[in-house]
Curated annotation (Swiss-Prot):
Domain of life: Bacteria
Record keyword Kinase present: no
Protein name: Ribosome maturation factor RimP
Primary location group: cytoplasm
Gene3D superfamilies tied to this protein: Ribosome maturation factor RimP, C-terminal domain (2.30.30.180), RimP-like superfamily, N-terminal (3.30.300.70)
Gene, per the UniProt record: rimP
Lineage: Bacteria, Pseudomonadati, Pseudomonadota, Alphaproteobacteria, Hyphomicrobiales
GO biological process, one term: ribosomal small subunit assembly
SUPFAM superfamilies the UniProt entry points to: YhbC-like, C-terminal domain, YhbC-like, N-terminal domain
InterPro entries attached to this UniProt entry: Ribosome_maturation_RimP (IPR003728), RimP_C (IPR028998), RimP_C_sf (IPR036847), RimP_N (IPR028989), RimP_N_sf (IPR035956)
Subcellular location: Cytoplasm
Annotated stretches, region: Disordered: 192-263
Originating species: Nitrobacter hamburgensis (strain DSM 10229 / NCIMB 13809 / X14)
Amino acid sequence: MTDPVDQIPDHELLDEPRLVVEPGVAARVSSVVAPVLQGMGYRLVRIKVSGEYGCTVQIMAERPDGSMQIEDCEAISKALSPVLDVADPIDKAYRLEISSPGIDRPLVRRSDFERHAGHLVKVEMAVAHQGRKRFRGILQGVKDNAIRLHRDDVQNVDESEVLLVMEDIADARLVLTDELIAESMRRGKIAEREMKRDLGILPPPPPHAKNDPARSPARRNAPKPKLKSTAKAHEKKPPKNTKEHRLAAERLRRGEIDPIEGE
C-alpha cells in the first residue's frame, strides 16, 4: 500500500509545523536547533531536557520520510554543537544527545497521524474530551482538524469511535506491536537502501540479476545470422604419411625403384 505522505514533497514536510511544542528551556533550545535541522534536511520531532547526568538535552529528529540512521545523528551532532555553544540557551553544562524517534515514536505533526493510520496509539489530551484526557485505540486517520480513533478500551460500540482535536493533544505516541515492528523494519530497509544509493555505495546486483545480453530473451529469440561457407579456407590437404608412402620410401632406400617413381 502506498503511503499518502510519500506523495508530499520533502520541502513541504520540512515546513510542516509541529502540533506539540515544548515550554521553558526546551523551547529556547528548539528555537536554536529547528532552523539548523531544517537547513540540513531534517525535521525536529521533540526536545527533552532532563536532570540525567547533571543535565541532558535530548534532541529527537528525523528525515522527511520518517527515517533516521546513525550517520544522520552524527552529522546533526557535529552541526549543532558549535551553534548551541554560541547561542548558549542553557546556563549550565549539559550533555547533548541526538536520537531517532524510535519505533514507538511520538506523533507531533499532522503527517505523523496520516502516515501511521492503522496502528495502535496512546493519546493524552491537554483539554479533556467528553470528560476524559487519556485515550487508547487504533488510529483511523485524520478528518479536518481532528484525528479519528477507534478505542479498544470500551465495550459500547457507540462510544468506540472518537474525534480528537489535534490542537488539544498534549502527547500522542505509537504503542509497540508486532505489526508496528514489521512496518518499521520495512521502512528502515528502504531508507538504508536509498541512503546507500545516494552515496553510491550500493553492492553489485547478484549474478542472476545482471543484464547479460547473451541470456536476454530478446537475444535468445533473435534469428541467427547466416554464416558464409568457409570450405575453401579450411580444405584439408591429402595426408603424406600413409602406408603407401612408407612402403615407397622403403623401396626407394633399397634401390628397388627410381626416385621419381617414389615421389
